[in-house]
């Protein structure tokens, strides 16, 4: 596949005192230590998988929803505006922090954890909530029953995909607020985050590009690609390096070398946990030039009023994801149809507040 992203990020060792940023919206605080930054005090918590960014995303979403309440007093609005600005600035600081790849510990298929009973839910039954459970490593799936194995894979992947899509939706919400208020600092940070900083664009072009790039990935596409690229979670790259989407890295120290590879430096990118793999995959589709047509068509469908964009409408624009081109598109199409993944397009995570 085409992938020239930077490596999966980690949080630096710099830390700072940050009193009560996440208080009020959650029952806990991020671990906090101390240091200063040129622009403002910056948050650097040593959380694998960037869970501090997730918490800030949730915090911003919670504050935005609370700010929209009609009967707030002017004092309450002012306090919420200030807290929202602080949380947004911390998010900017995180987006701007230079990050390096987290080391991964190669795991053995013989030591796969058991499938968690808490994830044994009916993915197609909309009366059942998708659990807010985000496991870090692929467990042992059913070896005897292929249908049951597929079901378990979807049960694991669906919460992860929905979680990262929620994060992207929060980014989108913050960007829309910044567009309305003219907050160029926020827009600059997201331009860097979504690969626009190197492009020679006017501010108006950058704003349009952000609106095109910062969009969730259709659930059925993410599930289908994860199933195809990981062999329904059975590939050694998934077991040993949490690699779900067959992304490449040109440094064997940061990935797992395939048995056969035309380039001696090529390896399948490894990740510290499964959600990092999902984040990297979605960032790739939302930023790499190979998927520009995919993003453009997605945006056109949104602008036409198609709020819940169908994955089947976008699959043809992923022909550059694999060397097989049109054959790969057909494989994804059949994967979605045969496994009825399109029926999961409207699934959402239950509201969990800041978690």
Language-model segments: residues:
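Catalytic cores of secreted/periplasmic lytic hydrolases that degrade extracellular macromolecules
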Residues: 2-224, 228-355
């Amino acid at each position: 596949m085409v992938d020239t992203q930077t490596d999966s990020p980690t949080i630096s060792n710099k830390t700072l005192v940050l009193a009560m940023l996440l208080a009020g919206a959650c029952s806990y605080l991020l671990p906090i230590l101390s240091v200063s930054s040129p622009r403002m005090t910056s948050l650097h918590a040593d959380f694998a998988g960037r869970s501090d960014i997730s918490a800030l995303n949730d915090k911003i979403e919670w504050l935005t929803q609370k700010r929209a309440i009609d009967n707030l007093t002017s004092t309450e609005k002012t306090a919420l505006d200030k807290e929202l600005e602080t949380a947004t600035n911390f998010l900017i600081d995180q987006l701007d922090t230079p990050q390096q790849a987290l080391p991964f510990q190669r795991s053995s298929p013989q030591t796969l954890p058991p499938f968690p009973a808490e994830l044994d839910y009916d993915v197609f039954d909309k009366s059942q909530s998708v659990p807010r459970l985000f496991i870090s490593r692929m467990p042992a799936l059913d070896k005897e029953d292929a249908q049951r194995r597929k079901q378990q894979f979807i049960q694991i992947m669906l919460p992860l995909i929905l979680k990262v899509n929620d994060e992207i939706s929060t980014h989108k919400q913050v960007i829309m607020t910044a567009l309305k208020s003219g907050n160029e600092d926020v827009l600059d940070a997201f331009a860097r985050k979504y690969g626009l900083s190197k492009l020679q664009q006017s501010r108006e072009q950058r704003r349009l590009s952000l609106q095109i790039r910062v969009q969730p990935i259709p659930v059925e596409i993410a599930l289908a690609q994860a199933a195809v690229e990981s062999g329904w979670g059975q590939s050694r790259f998934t077991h040993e390096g949490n690699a779900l989407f067959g992304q490449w890295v040109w440094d064997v120290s940061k990935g797992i070398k395939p048995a056969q590879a035309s380039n001696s430096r090529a390896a399948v990118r490894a990740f510290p946990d499964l959600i990092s793999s999902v984040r990297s995959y979605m960032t790739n589709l939302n930023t790499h030039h190979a998927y520009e047509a995919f993003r453009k068509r997605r945006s056109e469908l949104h602008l036409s009023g198609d709020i819940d964009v169908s994955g089947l409408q976008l699959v043809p624009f992923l022909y550059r994801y694999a060397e097989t081109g049109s054959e790969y598109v057909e494989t994804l199409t059949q994967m979605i149809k045969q496994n009825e993944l399109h029926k999961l397009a409207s699934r959402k995570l239950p509201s969990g507040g800041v978690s």
